[in-house]
C-alpha cells in the first residue's frame, strides 16, 4: 500500500509518521519526501480496520493536512514513465557505462541486435557498432555529443551519442557516468522529412511575436496575406521582411505556387530588367538562349522585390506598366506575355519622402501602398529578444553538434540593454559567432561580441533629474555597469577606458558594482 501525506514543513514530522508504523508492527518498504510538502509511504497491505485506524492517526498528527492512497511512489512512477517512453520509441536506444558496457536497452535496440534484455548487457558498444571508438570518445578530455553514419546488419543509421553527466550533491560538479546512444534509420528519416512540409500556418508560427506590437503586425499580416493586391512591407534592415513576405505567400491562395525574391539594390537596369522580365535569344552578346524572368517563372505565385526604394526611375516605369495589367515584353521580343503574379515589395526607406524628393514615382508609390505592414525594430521588441535568443541558441547548438548551453542570469539584461542597430539578423549572427567559440556549458555576456557604439546608455527624463553631479554619476554608473559585462576585471576595464587600475577599482567600489575574488587579475 502507498500513501501520500500532505503536510507542513515541520522538523520531526517524518519520524512521527514512522513511529506510527513501528507501533503497529507495519513493515515499511519505502519512504520518499517531496519538496512540495508531501511525504510518501510504502508498506505492506493491511486489513481494512487496521488501515482505517492508521489513516485516522495520521490525520491527527500535528502538521498533517490530508492523506490519501496513491498507486505509485514518485520514484516508481518516474521509472514506469521512463520505461514506457523507451518501449514506445521506434528508434533503437541504449545506454553504456564508462567502460562502454550496455546498461539499458529498449526493445527496438534488442530487436536490432537480436539480443534479449539480459544478453545485450554482456556486450560493449564497441562490439555492437563498428566504425566509432566509444572507449576513446569517453576517455577524451572534453566529451561532446557526436553524430556519425554507421551500418548495422546492412542497414544505414545516423548514430547520435550523448554523454551523461550526474552529480551526487549540489556542491559537486557534474561527473561523466556514461553515454546514451540513439540509432536513427535513414530510411525512416527520409519518410519523416517527406511529411515535414511547411504549411501556411506553420510558417507564421516561426515568427516570434511576444511583444504586443509584433503580435499585432503578425495578426494583420495573416489577414492581408489572403488578398491579391500588392503588399508593401516596411522595416529596418534585419527585421525579417523577407520571412514575413514568405509567410504571407504561403498563407495565401498562391501558397502552392512559386515564391521568388529579387534584391533591387545596386542592380544595373539591364540586369534588373532581364531578371524580372526575361530576354530573348540574342538580346545580349552572350545570351545564346532565351530566359524566362522572375515574373514568368513565378506565374500563379508571388514575387518579392526587396529594397524597392533602390530601384531606378527607368525600372520603376516598367514595373508600373506591369502592375497595371500583368503584361510585359521580354528584352529583345515584340510580343507581350501575360502572367498572374502577386507583387510583394519590401523597403527600409521612407518611400513617401523619396516621392517628395523626386526619387520615387508618385503613381508607383500609390500603386504599391495598398496593403502595408510596418515591422518594428528589435529595440522596440524587447520582450522578443530572449525568446529569439533561445531559438537561435538551440538551432545553432544542434547544427554544430554541441550540447545546448545554459543562458547565464546576466545574459538577459545584457542583450535587452543593447540597441541592436542590425535588429534580428545582428542578434542571430552574434549568437552564431558566440557558439562557435564557446568554452564550457554556459553562454555569458562576455561570450558575445557587439559593437560598443550601439550600447544603450541613453538617459531618459528620469535620469535627467537632479544636479549635474547626480546626472553625471548616473551616466557614469550606466557606462561602467554595461562595459563591466564585456570586460569583467578591473585591469581589462581600466585598459579599455584608458585609466588606471586604481581609478577603476575605486569607481566600481563607489557604485557598488561587485567584484569577485581574483577579478582584478
Curated annotation (Swiss-Prot):
Phenotype for residue 67 to A: Decrease in ability to repress DNA transcription. Loss of activity
Variant or mutagenesis effect after changing residue 402 to V: Decrease in ability to repress DNA transcription
Gene Ontology terms for molecular function: ATP binding; ATP hydrolysis activity; DNA binding
Chain positions recorded as ATP binding sites: 235-242, 298-307
Cellular component GO terms, alphabetical: cytoplasm
Main location: cytoplasm
The entry's keywords: Activator, Aromatic hydrocarbons catabolism, ATP-binding, Cytoplasm, DNA-binding, Nucleotide-binding, Repressor, Transcription, Transcription regulation
Location of the DNA-binding region in this protein: 489-509
Subcellular location: Cytoplasm
Pfam families associated with the record: HTH_50 (PF18024), Sigma54_activat (PF00158)
Gene Ontology annotations of biological process type: catabolic process; regulation of DNA-templated transcription
Chaperone among keywords: no
Domain (PAS) ranges: 78-120
Residue stretches making up the Sigma-54 factor interaction domain: 207-436
The keyword Cytoplasm belongs to this UniProt entry's keyword annotation: yes
Domain ACT: 2-72
Function: Dual transcriptional regulator of the TyrR regulon, which includes a number of genes coding for proteins involved in the biosynthesis or transport of the three aromatic amino acids, phenylalanine, tyrosine and tryptophan. These three aromatic amino acids act as effectors which bind to the TyrR protein to form an active regulatory protein. Acts by binding specifically to TyrR boxes in the promoter region of the target genes.
Quaternary state and interactors: Homodimer. In presence of tyrosine (or high concentrations of phenylalanine or tryptophan) and ATP, it self-associates to form an hexamer.
Protein name (record): HTH-type transcriptional regulatory protein TyrR
Organism of origin: Enterobacter agglomerans (Erwinia herbicola)
Lineage, broadest ranks: Bacteria, Pseudomonadati, Pseudomonadota, Gammaproteobacteria, Enterobacterales
Record gene name: tyrR
